[in-house]
Amino acid sequence: MSKPSSSPFFSETTSRLQDETVFFSLFPDSSLSSAALQSLHLEIIDFVSPFTSPYIWQHEPFSLSIALSSSCACTNTAIPHLHGKLKYGDNLEDEWFAVFLLFRISAAFPSNSIRVWDTDGEFLLIEAAFHLPRWLNPETSLNRVFIRGGDLHIVPRSRLPDPSLVASLRFLIERGNESRASDSVQSALKNRISDYPERAWRNMHRVRVRVPVSVAQVIRHEPFLISLAVEGFYDRDMDSMKHAAKMEKFLSKGREEKLVLVLVKMSRAMYGQLVQQKFQAPNCYPMPSVSDRDAFSEAELGMKIACGMEMMYQQRKKEGEDGKGISWSKYKDNLEKYGYFEGLLSGSKEYKRLMENAEEYHQKSSSFSRTRDIMSAPVRRIDEILALPYSEDDFKGQEVPASDNDSWLYDGEDELNSVLQERQKEMEFYNSKKERKNKGKEKQEAGSSSDANMNNFDLGDISKSMQQFMHKVSSYKGAEVPENRDFKEVSIDVDRFMKDIESMLGSQGRDEQADDDSDGSEGSSMDMDFDDVEDDSEGEESNEDAKESFEESYYGAMNEELKNSTLEKSFENVNQQHSSKQNEESSKTRDEKDDEFTPVDADFNLVKNLLESYSSQQGLPGPASNLLGLMGLQLPKDSGDKN
């Protein structure tokens, strides 16, 4: 068994919560007197009895007790209320059946607020996790979650940032309409408990077993003790196994003891715990022949029940727990402790009246608490039952119905898959809803941004951004967009670069009159020390003239090469808009026009090609939008006008 763990939802409690246990507290709107609280208690008992009477609980039954002070783990404040706990163990049906009962109680008694939690904390929120407000989490849920009027209520953080229990209860009374959880949260929880109580009743399994007469006698008088017998068998240890080997209480005659056939009702969880565990019958146990398969199967299951009953009985007796149930004397002591008699003298008229009311309440509530008392102290009750006269003949001649079909035990995979698929659909719906919301938000932001910038969008920004992008220095990994950092631009001495190119091409870099006998002082500019060059105005002018002359020669040679190719037709040329150029062009012959190679407008072609690529994407992701996005540009929507 895992270690007990305290819930993060209730970190203020000093005691550690029991594992596999659900806790609940019911707070009336007004501070009731002890008599009024007792009356409310009885009304609730009468209300839930029709739901719980056909049900066999796994460990202990659903019950409520009166707390005139802070006697439960949910609060340190002295608020008169009803509280209870239910250990559900391996049977989660018990926990959700209890939740169903609490919702029904809150609907039938709307002037009460109910809290429910377990070792996982606010498990109702876990069930509706996909529908909760984002601010609600284990740290902010303390004193916020209640059941009231048949609905779940969550005290809003905007109203009470750090609520106390008293403040939250007051808020529920005064502004309950503001605290009601959303319809999606209500639906998630209501769907979880919509099949109850029928689902709880369907969870019962009836099976034929052969048990010793003494065990049959106990089960006939107290059917719910089967849960303690199964618990004793399932949680057995080496010490309790010693009691099963002897069977002193329920098999006093040993192998001479007769087995009788009875029908036992238990939960499906109990049945699974019995069937799935292999257990060798004690030597003293009278098992039938294996050849009779039906009788042997019935006796084998009955043997496990009988051994569990024996182990439970002996263990409880050893621990001295018999006789510790709630009695009248203990109940009276509690009344005196909490001031029920208001300091009245014993024997006075008013004292007798209060005493009569207390006795009447105890008698009425004892029928409901009787099951709880017996299960908390079963030894005494078992002794009382076995002290009555009984024999094997009491169980002979009775028609025992057939066992329920237990195919559900082996078909659980289908049910599990169904639950998983339901959860998967819920998760997919949540994710799709979230995705639609994010897309809508992005569209709205993009739309407002593009609409605002539509008229102010400058196509020149594309070429400028591309130039900046091309001049960035990238690493060995390739072209990268710098994030929160600026790369230094390439530093180059243009004059020296041009002189070096000039020297290599030989177009303008050498003196035509130089002779081969030169001493090399006027050789290649590659050998020149630019730090030694005299920095005078004549030198600068000479360098500028040489640079311009080289550029004209270089571009002229390049155009001459390109004019004979078809490359020119794939680009847009420079628009000749100046009138002087138009006049010059008109004076030229057609042959001269054909020989010309009109320069290409690189920026215009860049923008044109990017826009055509962007338009062909038809609003979908693509290379153009990705590249422009990396450069921080967002184009307006394509209007479809190609002009």
From Swiss-Prot:
Compositionally biased spans, kind Basic and acidic residues: 581-592
Residue segments, region Disordered: 428-458, 501-600
Highest taxon of source: Eukaryota
Cysteine-cysteine disulfides: none
Skewed-composition ranges (Acidic residues): 528-543
Ranges of biased composition (kind: Polar residues): 446-456, 564-580
Protein family membership: Belongs to the ECD family.
Protein's name according to its UniProt entry: Protein ecdysoneless homolog
Organism of derivation: Arabidopsis thaliana (Mouse-ear cress)
Higher taxonomy: Eukaryota, Viridiplantae, Streptophyta, Embryophyta, Tracheophyta
